[in-house]
């Protein structure tokens, strides 16, 4: 049987006075009614909650606010010395919008707590689907492995690496689809090899053990291979009562496939659990492997692996002025509040620029449209009251930028620019969009 996923059943909790994140029935910041405790980790607790505005059940992950000196693992000194899970997830989750990645809906904060509002994994853990023998059929394992690789491939395309893929972090929504959760050990691409010792022992890649630096994409692929093996075999590929011996097996890539594995599955597992990261298969090779593509039409595979609609979903969220006001309260106004200083914790949101202007929205958006058309891009304006958003799309249909203007006061508006990914979007911002934020007399 696979190892226990360590889930924690709902439990009663005796809150400290004034701690709204620990008492069932309390309402968090006027919107979320807290329910039972779903689980806890080294740095956070997760609660069931109900959104009083929509009636939707959500999960709320609550952390001590480091700015209040709440301490994460070892106290305030440790928080200052290394990025805490809250900082990692706050940097990573806003980048991600994919059907198989747990969605961050909102970040809220009080003086003592920071709360992530997440989709609820109503279907429980992936490993709850294992049969009496402790494993899945090969077809069912393939179904969920496809969803896992779709999520991992997407994250890597966004420069995000999980580094702790394991059963506890593979959840199911109410439709039974996979959701990859918990990016507390995640990393963002910086062009360098990583040296941090991350991961869970049985799922850790051999190059991490060498402490010589590693490619986090290949580390994630290795962990996906261990998950696939466990789903189809019902036990770990590298297991030993002695942790040292288990590490030796991992480092040597020493394992045996069970007799019921098909030849194609054996081949794929051996390519993934290759102890040499240089020759280990990557996600592009995985999605073309015969076992992975078996019984799937070209169209179905393209639908599973395409990122375009996810990027569109991320950028084409319905924006209303009152929604923007609520978002700015959570991320900006609150961050500047003396009582809840989060500015040093979250920093700038990745890929997003905000510029304050003293002119009507229509004038700014007209300059944005002109800048896009000068580059030969497709430009469309949506929304009401001339506030946009304006979408600027490149030759391949990918979004280069989304620009929206929100009125703050009679003579003040804020222009929010969400930049696309890659060098093209960065160049367009610097060469065209940033200058377009200034009125003509100031250019």
From Swiss-Prot:
Cofactors named for this entry: Mn(2+)
Keywords tagged on the record: ATP-binding, Kinase, Manganese, Nucleotide-binding, Serine/threonine-protein kinase, Transferase
Sequence ranges assigned to domain NAF in this UniProt record: 313-347
Gene Ontology BP annotations: signal transduction
Active-site positions on this chain: 164 (proton acceptor)
Induction: By drought and salt stresses and abscisic acid (ABA).
Enzyme Commission number(s) from the entry: 2.7.11.1
MF terms in GO: ATP binding; protein serine kinase activity; protein serine/threonine kinase activity
PPI: annotated segments: 350-379
Activation loop: annotated span: 182-207
Function, in words: CIPK serine-threonine protein kinases interact with CBL proteins. Binding of a CBL protein to the regulatory NAF domain of CIPK protein lead to the activation of the kinase in a calcium-dependent manner.
Comment, domains: The activation loop within the kinase domain is the target of phosphorylation/activation by upstream protein kinases. The PPI motif mediates the interaction with the ABI (abscisic acid-insensitive) phosphatases.
Family: Belongs to the protein kinase superfamily. CAMK Ser/Thr protein kinase family. SNF1 subfamily.
Protein name: CBL-interacting protein kinase 29
